[in-house]
């Protein structure tokens, strides 16, 4: 074990001087002897000084304090002992439930699996959310992004997905809270507890109020735990909320380390940092990692470098739109903007593909006709267009759905709709079978059978 001493402290950046023969390597974890604070080596400056980022608050530090090199990167506990626990970036428990007592620790910096170890993803993962299963189906072992601006429902959608998939899917889940609100982390913990799925979920939190080092590395901590489960032969779900905060923490660290900023003030290493994280989130011949990531879109601009860099790595993108939310339709998924590589007749089958494309084409036609309707009114449309508009408005409302995790706010019981029922429902609307039903009958409801049941008397 080699020791050095602190020579400079600038916020979260701490310089440490070592002797000639004991220079730490990049990404080595150092421990401040007096406070127990962990530092991660980012740069070697020359004159035997290394520049580090603190994995915690730097209050109470002073120049001259002794620092010990642990001789390797940050290591975190992995395995079944982490299930049902809340941990920080260093894998230390923060839920006041005692030691984790793990037998195995893994370093958070690892290489992505080799090309020959990878396994392609073609099997569908049913979520029970109509709009997602129909328009942008998820692949088991794929990567999904939930894109949206502030307050359009990314976290609520993610909580619903976790609840539905964790109950239906018997594998393990890892939730990595990156730079999000502490309140949401607390709500999430209690939601998992009440749904009786907490014993299958590992929770790793690095909240908004924590230093940039914690927020930058907490995604890697969660990913390392998921990789262990995958390599043990399990199918794992990895939830990251929010990838944008990961990028933002990287921007802060980059500026603190004195790097020249790139476009819109982001770090020059944005693409390589994102690639290093995303390439590790993959499925191998041993097991799979299905990843669902919330992506905040600054100022609702999808061309911003952060969301734009994330797009390249994903198999499916669920775009949450403010325009849809303004209509009171939740989940506020934009069916025309959301995409999935799985929406292919060879994967989902001809019927599913044709119904999904039919729904998109009717909604696109309605979008084109909106200006004419606003200026001239419905009467000026052809009979065919009137039918299209009527069906589009029913489809729009039928894409809404009551969530289990929102029951306390809405008072409406949540609904899980199977993929088969979803396809049957939208096909019935497209084929004109539901033309006699009022629009409002389709709002915030589960399957098409419920629409028929509740409106039997009215017809």
Curated annotation (Swiss-Prot):
CDD domains: ATP-synt_F1_beta_C, ATP-synt_F1_beta_N, F1-ATPase_beta_CD. It is found in: Cell inner membrane. Keywords: ATP synthesis, ATP-binding, Cell inner membrane, Cell membrane, CF(1), Hydrogen ion transport, Ion transport, Membrane, Nucleotide-binding, Translocase, Transport. SMART domains: AAA. ATP binds at residues 148-155. Coiled coil: none annotated. It is a peripheral membrane protein. InterPro entries: AAA+_ATPase, ATP-synt_VA_C, ATP_synth_F1_bsu, ATPase_a/bsu_AS, ATPase_alpha/beta_chains, ATPase_F1/V1/A1_a/bsu_N, ATPase_F1/V1/A1_a/bsu_N_sf, ATPase_F1/V1/A1_a/bsu_nucl-bd. Its EC number is 7.1.2.2. It catalyses: ATP + H2O + 4 H(+)(in) = ADP + phosphate + 5 H(+)(out). Its main location: membrane. One of its GO terms (molecular function) is ATP hydrolysis activity. One of its GO terms (cellular component) is plasma membrane. It is an enzyme of class 7 (translocase). NCBIfam families: atpD. F-type ATPases have 2 components, CF(1) - the catalytic core - and CF(0) - the membrane proton channel. CF(1) has five subunits: alpha(3), beta(3), gamma(1), delta(1), epsilon(1). CF(0) has three main subunits: a(1), b(2) and c(9-12). The alpha and beta chains form an alternating ring which encloses part of the gamma chain. CF(1) is attached to CF(0) by a central stalk formed by the gamma and epsilon chains, while a peripheral stalk is formed by the delta and b chains. Belongs to the ATPase alpha/beta chains family. Produces ATP from ADP in the presence of a proton gradient across the membrane. The catalytic sites are hosted primarily by the beta subunits. This is ATP synthase subunit beta. The gene is atpD.
